[in-house]
C-alpha cells in the first residue's frame, strides 16, 4: 500500500507545513527532550520541503537547503512511526535526489545521526568519518555525488 504515497515539493506557505513541523518535532526532537517550536525556524522559508502524503495525511518529510549552485543539504528527514521500515525513507530520498539532479545540483550532503549511517550508505552516501554532536547526539557528515 506504499504505492499510494504521493510525493511532492512544497514550501512553508503550504497547508501541509504545520504537519511538517509537527512530524519533525514528534520524530526528531521530542524523543531527545527537545522542542522544535523553540528553535529558529526562519530558514525553513528558504528551503524546499519534500513531503510524502497518503490519504491526505503527512507520512514523511525532509528539508532541502540550497548551499551553492551545485550543492544541496538534506535536513530533518522524518518518517511517521507507523511508516518506518517500509521503504518510505528510500522513496522520499530518491525523490529528493531526482529533484536535485533535475535542477542541476550535483552534490548532496547531510548530517546523519550515527544510528542512520547504514541507511544512507545503502543509498550511496559516503562519510568522512569525523563524528560531531548536534542536538546532543553523535552525527557524521555524509555526501553523495549525483553526477
Please place each PLM-identified region on the residue numbering.
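Active-site rim helix/loop that mediates acceptor-substrate recognition in acyltransferases
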Residues: 25-59
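A conserved beta-turn-beta hairpin within the catalytic core of GNAT-like acetyltransferases
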Residues: 66-77, 84, 134-138
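Conserved catalytic-core motifs of GNAT/GCN5-like acyltransferases
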Residues: 109-111, 121, 126-141
